[in-house]
Amino acid sequence: MASKFLREYKLVVVGGGGEGKSCLTIQLIQSHFVDEYDPTIEESYRKQCVIDDEVALLDVLDTAGQEEYSAMREQYMRTGEGFLLVYSITSRQSFEEIMTFQQQILRVKDKDYFPIIVVGNKCDLDKERVVSKQEGESLARQFGCKFIETSAKSRINVENAFYDLVREIRRYNKEMSNPSGFGARAPDSKMDVSEPGESAGCCGKCIVM
């Protein structure tokens, strides 16, 4: 039975331009794929769901990837509780930009670790792949965080990416509140790349707010 306490989670989707951040977010919230989408400045979406028998209100901020909006980044990085660092497996540049975003998040938060998941998007375009799965896994290990490949178009692992970030936030907060611990640490192991398709039973009914 799901808990009735409604906890809000401020999730931020970060990455360069054109790697599918907005498509991932809209697929999660509205369950459809957008072929054409205007470059995002900043869009916020809300969705209520149940993750591991706990009710959660996801407040998802889809951010600008373009360089001209870089001055806005520190503002949303200060308020975010967890971050999806998204790159396209078809773009080497978007992959290389992930390091900059991760370092900026840790600098703004003044932390050695913070809830982050590395997301390799557009995994349905495997024939156009220029970033291997192993490279994504290696970068996530370097960050001490989890890794997953997704496809907004084919709806592969879309919910898993967001829900696993919520789980990581919960784990982080639990460690931070543990008086006998020394603060939150990175996960002990990376996330294995899930097979195509959403995992069954990880979430109950979801409601767009």
UniProtKB/Swiss-Prot annotation:
Compartments where found: Cell membrane
Transmembrane feature ranges: none
Induction: Expression is dependent upon interaction with host roots.
Topological relation to the membrane, as annotated: Lipid-anchor
BP GO annotations: signal transduction
Broad class of the protein's primary localization: membrane
InterPro entries noted in UniProt: P-loop_NTPase, Small_GTP-bd, Small_GTPase, Small_GTPase_Ras-type
Identification of the protein by name: Ras-like protein
